Amino acid sequence: AFSGILADADIAAALKACEAADSFNYKAFFAKVGLSAKSAEDIKKAFFVIDQDKSGFIEEDELKLFLQVFSAGARALTDAETKAFLKAGDSDGDGAIGVDEFAVLVKA
């Protein structure tokens, strides 16, 4: 799903680092997976991969399954992780993360 944007080895390392429940940290994940160093264009491409229902927003249910977008066998985020991730990214308080909010979150 992220071919041409992210390296498989980086994805594997990032997923391994947050295997344990409640160990997910979006800043560490985006850095490890190599997304925070990418261009605005690549970050936008990644957003549209994560936006599974193509609504133009990443909603809470998509955040919960965020890691599975990177690898089908990855775990779901816990409710606490999901809520913290949403709170960090949802700067306008509409309950979802838009493409611009996502770009800010990745570069945070």
Curated annotation (Swiss-Prot):
Q: Where, in this chain's numbering, is Ca(2+) 1 bound? A: 51, 53, 55, 57, 59, 62
- Molecular function in Gene Ontology: calcium ion binding
What cellular-component terms does GO give this entry? cytoplasm
Matches recorded under SUPFAM superfamilies: EF-hand
Enumerate the Pfam families for this protein: EF-hand_7 (PF13499)
List, alphabetically, the SMART domains matched. Answer: EFh
Residues annotated to bind Ca(2+) 2 = 90, 92, 94, 96, 101
Disulfide-bonded cysteine pairs: these are none
Q: Which UniProt keywords apply?
A: Acetylation, Allergen, Calcium, Metal-binding, Muscle protein, Repeat
Domain EF-hand stretches: 38-73, 77-108
The yes or no answer to whether the keyword tRNA-binding is present is no
InterPro entries for the chain: EF-hand-dom_pair (IPR011992), EF_Hand_1_Ca_BS (IPR018247), EF_hand_dom (IPR002048), Parvalbumin (IPR008080)
Sites where N-acetylalanine occurs are at: 1
Q: Which family does it belong to?
A: Belongs to the parvalbumin family.
Q: What else is known?
A: Is regarded as an important allergen. On the 2D-gel the determined pI of this protein is: 4.23, its MW is: 11.35 kDa.
State its role.
Answer: In muscle, parvalbumin is thought to be involved in relaxation after contraction. It binds two calcium ions.
The protein, known as: Parvalbumin beta 3
